[in-house]
Amino acid sequence: MLTSQYLLSTSKDIPYDAKIISHQLMIRSGMIRKTSSGLYVWLPTGMRVLKKIKNIITTEMEKINALEILMPIIQPEYLWKESRRLNLYGEELLRFLDRRKNQFILGPTNEEVVTNFIGSEIHSYKQLPLTVYQIQTKFRDEIRPRFGIIRTREFTMKDAYSFHINQSCLENTYNKFYDSYINIFKKMNLNFCAVKADSGSMGGNISHEFQAFSQNGEDEIVFSNDKLYSSNMNMAESIETIDFFKKKYSSCLIKNKTNTKKSIIMSEKLNTPLINQIQTFLIQTKINDITSIAALLIRGDHELNFFKVEKIDIINKPLVFLNEKEVISLIGVKKEFLGPLGLKVPIIADISTFNMKNFTIGSNINKHFFINVNWNIDLPMPIFKDIRKVTKNDLSPNGSGYLNIKQSIEIGHIFQLGQKYSRKIQQSVKIKNGNLKNLYMGCYGIGITRIAAAVIEQHHDKNGIIWPDSIAPFEVVILPINMKKDNKIKIIAHFLYKKFKKTGIDVILDDRDERPGVMFNEVDLIGIPHQIIISKRSINYDNVEYRERKNKENILINIKDIKNFIIQKLKK
């Protein structure tokens, strides 16, 4: 590729809404342009990166015998009604009517369509197992698109689906995908980890997320310093949770000794440390289809884990907390003075509050608190559940390490779905005895566009992107200095360009009449890993100058040796 024939589209300006480095660099390097909230045009440089990401994924899919298909992005709504996910997905589904008033959606995922289609193609257990995949655009009507392409409304995914006659066959394919994802992300030089995760609206009992570390990531992952435990924040537990539910806490009532029990008092001042306080939240519940209220209690220095709270049977999903006006109307007090004493609603307390003594709570009287409160003496024992987020330095579930927390970007997710979709959409196959059996299913996703952002988050410096060779828009750039004024430089530049092209090296030649500083700045911004500089000074000694983007190392290499030198570099 010649730069004079290429849409470079680099920019010095950073848009006001580009808050994180990957978003800024993708715009400045000419990878993407925003058309509307959460919608982007991918320019040639960005498309070259996406193409290489797709090639790596396709190669790995072929290794595990996954067959490529392509499903429509528009899906009939009735399939989502059959799977009972239409309302579960909520307003993220973009729904519309065609001219005949038929109901459709723009697909955010394809479990319903693929189950329906595969069910009509597979009739016998002898055709199983079978795995299909596609690389396609998806759409989710995000309420708040942000962070560039990390959280968009339209995005590109690789989604794969496997079908099986039994659970053990599903587990075998699931493990193959797990290993395949490890290979894929390693080839892209990503610093990542795989963690246990919840299946959410997808369903199933087992799933793993693949998370790329990033200080700008939306997710939090939890892992122990002994490397024996990892989880996403939603599901993370500490040894406190494990120990608590091993015991029958209902028979282990707190017995305060007389010398430790202090008299409960009312105070206008809140001078106790957060670790000795209990916060109270009111939340909507549904018991026997009747909407009501429950109270949630956590320690003052802890944070509610919304995911864990939603797992409680009586809690409405999504969570609906009472606001200030509603609390005042119901209890007659501002939220900050809300407490559990005297509340005539179900009370659910985090297990970390179980052993608390002489703690502080809101008094349900404005500007007052109760101090020196104790369970079973001043307050009846509530229902205890694990409803908090773990914190740094909590003991890990096995008790042998301490928990650490890092921010991350989810780049892949795999699920064992079991028979969830085949039962609801009524897809079955004939087994050996002639009976019909519902298919077992797995589903495996990779966020292709999101990977590009994750790599940039991990591989950049003050000058721009530092792409790994495997997904760089170009592997090599040739930078002839003052080529228009020196014909020898021009001849050597085009000679090397043709030589690299013939060898299959992905190369671009900057043949513009630009100042050296502009050329160097642009290739550093774009992040081309291997740079060859041709100047009058170097060619006088039959040399060219090689510079590696990631370490700025400059080496003089003889012109006749440069091709083999680059080939060896690309093999590493």
Curated annotation (Swiss-Prot):
GO cellular component: cytosol
Cysteine disulfide partners in this protein: none
PROSITE patterns: AA_TRNA_LIGASE_II
Subcellular location: Cytoplasm
Main location: cytoplasm
Keywords per UniProt: Aminoacyl-tRNA synthetase, ATP-binding, Cytoplasm, Ligase, Nucleotide-binding, Protein biosynthesis
Keyword Electron transport: no
GO terms of molecular function: aminoacyl-tRNA deacylase activity; ATP binding; proline-tRNA ligase activity
Pfam families given in the database record: HGTP_anticodon (PF03129), tRNA-synt_2b (PF00587), tRNA_edit (PF04073)
Highest taxon of source: Bacteria
Enzyme Commission identifier(s): 6.1.1.15
Subunit structure of this chain's protein: Homodimer.
Role this protein plays: Catalyzes the attachment of proline to tRNA(Pro) in a two-step reaction: proline is first activated by ATP to form Pro-AMP and then transferred to the acceptor end of tRNA(Pro). As ProRS can inadvertently accommodate and process non-cognate amino acids such as alanine and cysteine, to avoid such errors it has two additional distinct editing activities against alanine. One activity is designated as 'pretransfer' editing and involves the tRNA(Pro)-independent hydrolysis of activated Ala-AMP.
The record's note on its domains: Consists of three domains: the N-terminal catalytic domain, the editing domain and the C-terminal anticodon-binding domain.
Protein name in the entry: Proline--tRNA ligase
Native organism: Buchnera aphidicola subsp. Acyrthosiphon pisum (strain APS) (Acyrthosiphon pisum symbiotic bacterium)
GN (gene name): proS
